[in-house]
């Protein structure tokens, strides 16, 4: 069978069924086989087709009305990302906080109290080291006990680990506390995009997964506001209060997630069909969807991916799943190669560009607020224009701006060049959250097979940390006065790596906008070239 042909737009958008399919659907309209564990695919296939067509034909607003609670629970799960965001930005801001530098730093005759380059980098990578371990724990844990309980477990451990950070009296203890805090971060970041992409219909997958980037921005806003307020404060209070604020989040989130429904896709994978139906009913309005048909749609996809053995990490690197794994890993890793490190180190970047500490903190807060606004704008762009389109155009603009940053940093130390470097740093940090960053979360949530999703998102985030950890050392060295002292000239470095990522994405990143998980599975199996996904047609009856 040919894998691609010219698209009939009308037929594709309406997903019109053949007379045979219509007759089959009416013959099984009582949904009798949908929740029958012994039923074969042929018994419930017509209902599965009906549910998939219903999702395809939903508009965005209609999808929100049909699945209001799915939107809410995706919001709650995404909120867990605030924990990592808050702490990452907190440690990055602490290296510029006078009270923190005075307590934990060394005295430099030129710059006053400073945190040495080695300890700056160590503090910035410590949480990521823990998270790298955490993402490998997340996959097997989630496959066994589900997204909810794995995340709740992480939240409870996080409460204890914050205690160590709060009472730390030395940089080595802070380093250890951050590694421990990173363990639950790994669970949150691996589970959130997978859970969010599984509980919403097709039209809501983009905004549901992009909420992760929004909460990342919110975490940085909170940190920016708190550290700006406490920047002039003397003594331990200046950093103890920002640390203690972390306790606001874990317990309320754990309670809410205890009340949340489990992913129906995970329940279907476990053969718990009645529970899956209950979960679907809690996620959507029963008056607007047929619950048994929705479960049948999930069963059809799970059956296509069926394997008698438990999912394992080695499977991620076999056959077509290797390509899917590489896309997820690439989308994650590229964030650190296309401007993310400038965004994460915004305050320190502004300070090294020549701005006063108070101005740097204020500009960092403004940057975070603009990122939050631009993330919400990205929901519209990615939903209607597509993931590949936004990712490629956003990355191209990002590369141009990074090169411009390098040029601005090369023309001298005048006020004009300092202002240009600061302005471009702000623009790069903000536009990164309009294009490549939020599009990445959608790609990560959609690409993997349902069966291997917890493992794939975990290994993908691991690639993020594996790339980020050495680059944090490099980035700190490039900016630090006792290191490379490049300032804006670091734009040349990240512009070069960003260009490489753009070229790779152009040839290998497919467009998955508007595709059901069945269609995505089939298109990967047929090895359709990435640039032809947008025009490929998959028949509603196809299972392979």
How would you label these PLM feature ranges?
Residues 2-281, 303-544:
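Alpha-helical transmembrane bundle of multi-pass membrane proteins
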Residues 284-286:
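ABC-type ATPase nucleotide-binding domains, specifically the catalytic core motifs of the NBD
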Residues 288-303:
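Short, well-structured alpha-helical segments
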């Amino acid at each position: 069978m040919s894998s691609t042909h010219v698209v009939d737009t009308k037929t594709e958008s309406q997903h019109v069924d053949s007379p045979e399919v219509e007759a089959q659907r009416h013959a099984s309209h009582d949904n009798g086989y949908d929740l029958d564990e012994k039923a074969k695919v042929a018994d419930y296939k017509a209902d599965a087709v009906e549910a998939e067509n219903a999702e395809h034909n939903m508009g965005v607003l209609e999808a929100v009305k049909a699945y209001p609670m799915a939107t809410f629970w995706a919001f709650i799960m995404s909120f867990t990302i605030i924990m990592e965001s808050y702490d990452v930005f907190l440690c990055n801001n602490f290296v510029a906080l006078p009270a923190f530098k005075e307590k934990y730093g060394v005295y430099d005759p030129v710059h006053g109290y400073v945190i040495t380059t080695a300890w700056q980098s160590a503090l910035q990578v410590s949480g990521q080291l823990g998270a790298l371990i955490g993402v490998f724990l997340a996959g097997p844990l989630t496959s066994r006990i589900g997204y909810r309980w794995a995340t709740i477990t992480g939240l409870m451990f996080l409460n204890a680990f914050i205690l160590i950070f709060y009472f730390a009296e030395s940089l080595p203890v802070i380093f250890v506390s951050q590694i421990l805090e990173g363990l639950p971060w790994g669970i949150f970041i691996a589970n959130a995009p997978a859970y969010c992409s599984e509980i919403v219909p097709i039209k809501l997958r983009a905004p549901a997964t992009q909420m992760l980037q929004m909460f990342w921005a919110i975490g940085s806003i909170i940190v920016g506001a708190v550290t700006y307020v406490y920047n002039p404060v003397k003594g331990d209070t200046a950093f103890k209060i920002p640390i203690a604020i972390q306790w606001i989040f874990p317990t309320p989130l754990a309670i809410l997630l205890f009340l949340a429904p489990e992913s129906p896709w995970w329940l279907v994978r476990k053969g718990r069909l009645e529970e899956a139906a209950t979960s679907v009913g809690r996620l959507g309005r029963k008056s607007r969807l047929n619950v048994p048909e929705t479960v049948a749609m999930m069963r059809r996809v799970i059956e296509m991916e069926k394997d008698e053995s438990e999912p394992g990490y080695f499977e991620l690197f076999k056959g077509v799943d290797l390509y899917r794994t590489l896309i997820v890993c690439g989308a994650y890793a590229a964030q650190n190669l296309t401007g993310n490190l400038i965004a994460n180190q915004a305050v320190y970047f502004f300070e090294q560009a020549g701005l006063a500490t108070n101005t740097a903190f204020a500009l960092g807060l403004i940057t975070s607020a603009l990122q939050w606004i631009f993330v919400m704008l990205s929901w519209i762009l990615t939903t209607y224009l597509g993931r590949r389109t936004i990712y490629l155009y956003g990355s191209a603009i990002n590369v141009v701006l990074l090169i411009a940053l390098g040029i601005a940093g090369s023309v001298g130390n005048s006020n004009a060049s300092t202002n240009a470097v600061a302005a471009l740093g702000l623009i790069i940090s903000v536009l990164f959250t309009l294009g490549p960053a939020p599009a990445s979360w959608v790609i990560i949530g959609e690409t993997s097979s349902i069966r291997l999703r917890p493992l794939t998102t975990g290994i993908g985030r691991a690639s993020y940390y594996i790339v980020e950890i050495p680059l944090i050392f490099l980035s700190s060295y490039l900016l630090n006065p006792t290191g490379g002292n490049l300032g804006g000239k670091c734009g040349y470095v990240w512009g070069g790596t960003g260009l490489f990522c753009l070229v790779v994405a152009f040839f290998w990143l497919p467009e998955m906008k508007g595709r059901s998980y069945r269609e995505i599975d089939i298109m990967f199996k047929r090895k359709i070239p990435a640039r032809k996904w947008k025009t490929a047609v998959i028949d509603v009856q196809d299972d392979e």
